[in-house]
Regions:
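Conserved N-terminal entry element of GNAT/NAT acetyltransferase domains
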Residues: 1-11, 135
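Acetyl-CoA-dependent GNAT
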Residues: 33-80
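Short aromatic/hydrophobic contact patches that present stacked aromatics
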Residues: 4, 72-74, 104-106, 131
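Hydrophobic alpha-helical core bundles mediating ligand binding, dimerization, or RNAP-core interactions
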Residues: 16-21, 40, 44
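Conserved GNAT acetyl-CoA-binding A-motif
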Residues: 98-110
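Helix-loop element at the rim of GNAT/NAT acetyltransferase active sites that forms part
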Residues: 8, 18-33
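Conserved acetyl-CoA-binding loop-helix of GNAT-fold acetyltransferases
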Residues: 83-97, 112-120
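Conserved catalytic-core motifs of GNAT/GCN5-like acyltransferases
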Residues: 106-107, 124-135
Length: 135
């Protein structure tokens, strides 16, 4: 099993949108609903994260991992490849590549798999954040 991380590029836009579709309806923190493709494409092209990689397993794209400029970490692996230890390997490779001393993971409080995953890797619960949008 060969796991690699490669920086995203414009050829990954469709794949990344597919991951968003796969996550739709799953407890996640970044999207309440699927954005239009054009909005997604513009977002990816804007290079919003200092580190954003595609996860490759034996040269097949299976997920992505990113780090924001505020050290917030996000990872998603396609359902077919979850619960195989890949996320643990990816997290270690990514943190070694990035080399930061601190990482934050924003996790929906009902996403028990993610809470367990990050806890297993030494992340500790520090706060619950609440959001209010005013139209």
């Amino acid at each position: 099993m060969e796991i690699e991380l490669k920086p995203i590029n414009e050829q990954d836009i469709d794949f990344l949108y597919g991951l968003l579709k796969e996550r739709e309806g799953i407890v996640n923190i970044s999207h309440k609903e699927l954005p239009p493709f054009s909005e997604h494409e513009q977002f990816v092209k804007s290079s919003p994260y200092p580190y954003w990689d595609i996860i490759l397993l034996n040269n097949e794209r299976i997920g992505n991992i990113y780090l924001t400029d505020r050290d917030e970490l996000g990872i998603f692996i396609s359902k077919d490849f979850q619960n195989q230890g890949i996320g643990s390997i990816v997290l270690q490779k990514f943190m070694k590549k990035v080399g930061k001393k601190r990482y934050l993971a924003n996790v929906n409080p009902t996403n028990y798999k993610s809470i367990q995953f990050f806890g297993k890797h030494g992340f500790t619960h520090i706060q619950n954040t609440y959001h209010k949008k005013i139209d």
